[in-house]
């Protein structure tokens, strides 16, 4: 039987600090120390890939390249690439609890440019950069070139580029490489900064017994290096434009469905190539994570396909995905891997069978359990091979969710959880998942801190105001630490060496 364990869900961007956004610096190391101190096993984060307009980590210019916002300036200073005066006194935003992405976009760039320029004076770092480039030829040159060209077009999306370079014609690419050498080097070296800092942080966490649960979106963005260099992997027209886009059909929560806009995969082409790109993508993910959550798992059994010109997601069609064949190929190439399947939303018998056949643990969200007396998300219906959550980045925090319930529904929740007089409703919910039979129990940081609805990370199908929440260092009191450690040990979820998911 697998070892019971627990962890915290909080993205890097939500860490406290002085740079307007959470980074790989001191606060990240202190967060690892907190996880160790409270006997946790997992730190779950959102995708680390570079973000685009809307700031969502699920819409990236690359399926591999890292988010430059997470690079820590103090660590660059310790490496001799920056002076403290290069970043101290810079305005990164006045609100310590919210990220101002537009401000950061303009404030961080000149500082990173200075660090990139200073690498030219450090021979040992230049050797490390050269080694990094040699080890990442499968994605790094294309990414750096793509971003440099995008910048030269005023950051316009791929479909607004000149036709020759949009189609990746060799002569055009050679011309842009010659013209944009400095910009290409910037995007190359900053990836070196990103991966050096992240892998050092991950090593520190692993040495403390903390494993990183990463996140892989099912789809890539239509404005991405993959769409540019591998258009044949998607359903496209003769101009390399997507014929269809992804989303979810209408339901009780979204009467017009969810129109995500990502290009749809040509699964027939992937199969012809033995799913080599997927094997590669998963392999790259496990270079930076210990465990991998795969988003929208249902999309591998059936996916909702919407015409590219549609204004909403109502009139799509269900199309067949690759099914278990894809995951058998991944297992054949990479062995058994610790993967979590995000099986939320509309799940039919076919999707359930795919989850069962894969053997991956699915997710249970306690907020989804009420007020349905028969819900499979009620803890007494959990199975051991599952991951229990109070909520995720797409849910309201417990306090915000609870406030929206009717008085009768609130009473039902309190009675089911047998809420004690000395407990908040959030603490009762955390106890509910920790005491369940699920092998793994994950609490959002907002819920551990008993935050209100203003700390919600994301409202799906909305633009603006998302992905901004940050904790304050003083939020994490000794009382909160003691509560988490006590609950973790009471329900036999304390960390042990060689824990496996």
Language-model-detected regions and their locations in the chain:
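Conserved, well-ordered alpha-helix/loop/beta-strand core segments that scaffold catalytic motifs
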Residues: 187, 191-220
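Surface-exposed amphipathic alpha-helices with a cationic face
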Residues: 36, 198-206, 331, 355-356
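Catalytic domains of carbohydrate-active enzymes, especially glycoside hydrolases
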Residues: 26-51, 288-289
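Mature N-terminal, pre-catalytic/accessory segment of carbohydrate-active enzymes
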Residues: 1-26, 38
